[in-house]
A protein has these predicted regions:
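Acidic, metal-coordinating catalytic cores used for nucleic-acid/nucleotide bond scission
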Residues: 98-106, 126-128, 234
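Short, surface-exposed basic-aromatic patches at helix termini and helix-loop junctions that form
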Residues: 110-119
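An anionic, glycine-rich sequence signature occurring as long contiguous blocks
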Residues: 119-221, 280, 307-315
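Electropositive, glycine- and tryptophan-enriched low-complexity nucleic-acid-binding patches
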Residues: 38-91
Length: 315
């Protein structure tokens, strides 16, 4: 007997969780009386601010509907606890690195990650205490840029141990100091990783979280995940899950493409317009439904390849 078609399995072999706080590009504006909506002064609108999680390769993990306000440490810890329980139930040996911005860098999160064996690298909001460590470095970096402005921005790094008064212990802090024509720019991150080089920690580990904004764009813009017009919060949460399923289908379609082809990095809307929106003739027969595709269409070769991979998307 022939072997059944291999189903596409949503494995999570990678070690990084991209924890995204929906910011400027992901504000979910609403125009009705939906539950959990709050007013956002920045946008001058009512809306939601869901927590969205991806892994390091773009797999969709989860999305939780919530009001448009900064989450507290206890809320974040409770969310992390449920998320880790679900991951460990299926992938008990997967190592997890949590990357997130300063809105999630709270003492509750730091203590919980340490107690549960999670690696983390989080953005830290600048404070007077932290700036005391890099005052001289900022001055020398600015002088270096002014001495040779044509060479571009000057960037330097420094690491030290310090912490906020609310933290239970001091943490390893990495400061990135940059000077350019636009003025000085300093960022701080906190981490428990063993990587020694501060530049590698910031540029090769932390900065990769910027790719998550592209995942957010694919989910929200190309798949219309911001259509949360139901009155009940549970109904809008279900909408997020349905759009998560759509994301998985499109992501699975994209990763089935040849590795060195343009389709492997194509946006979801490109895949939909070029490969999915193809005219076809559907014929209903007694024992089957036959689909007749056009004899010619754009990207016909890649379409033929995609049709051969469709069984992998069946779950």
């Amino acid at each position: 007997m022939p072997k059944p078609a291999q189903a596409y399995e949503p494995k999570i072999p990678v070690k990084v969780l991209e924890w995204i706080r929906p910011a400027l590009a992901t504000f979910d504006a609403v125009h009705g009386g939906q539950q959990l909506r709050l007013f956002n002064a920045h946008y001058d609108e009512y809306g939601f601010q869901p927590i969205v999680v991806f892994d390091g390769e773009g797999r969709f993990i989860t999305a939780v509907l919530r009001p448009t306000k900064r989450p507290g440490g206890k809320e974040v810890r409770a969310f992390l606890r449920r998320l880790l329980r679900a991951i460990r139930a299926n992938w008990p040996k997967t190592e997890i690195l949590l990357r997130a911005d300063s809105h999630y860098c709270s003492p509750e999160v730091l203590d919980w990650c340490r107690a549960n064996g999670l690696d983390y690298i989080l953005d830290v909001a600048p404070t007077t205490t932290l700036r005391r460590h890099i005052g001289n470095l900022e001055a020398s970096t600015k002088a270096r840029f002014e001495a040779a402005p044509k060479e571009g921005k000057a960037r330097r790094f420094k690491e030290f141990f310090d912490g906020a008064a609310s933290w239970s212990r001091v943490e390893r802090i990495v400061a990135r100091v940059e000077a350019g024509a636009e003025g000085p720019d300093t960022r701080f991150i906190v981490t428990n990783l063993k990587v020694r080089n501060a530049r590698v920690l910031y540029e090769d580990v932390y900065c990769r979280r910027g790719q998550a904004e592209n995942h957010i764009k694919s989910w929200k813009t190309h798949l219309a995940a911001d259509r949360t017009s139901c009155t009940k919060a549970t109904a809008n949460q279900l909408r997020l899950f349905l759009h998560a399923g759509a994301y998985w289908l499109m992501w699975g379609l994209r990763v089935s493409m040849p590795k060195r082809s343009m389709w492997r990095v194509a946006q979801f809307d490109t895949l939909r317009l070029r490969l999915i929106k193809v005219a076809a003739r559907v014929v209903e027969m007694k024992t089957m439904i036959r689909i007749h595709l056009p004899t010619s269409c754009p990207a016909q070769d890649i379409l033929r390849l995609v049709l051969g991979h469709i069984p992998r998307l069946v779950t």
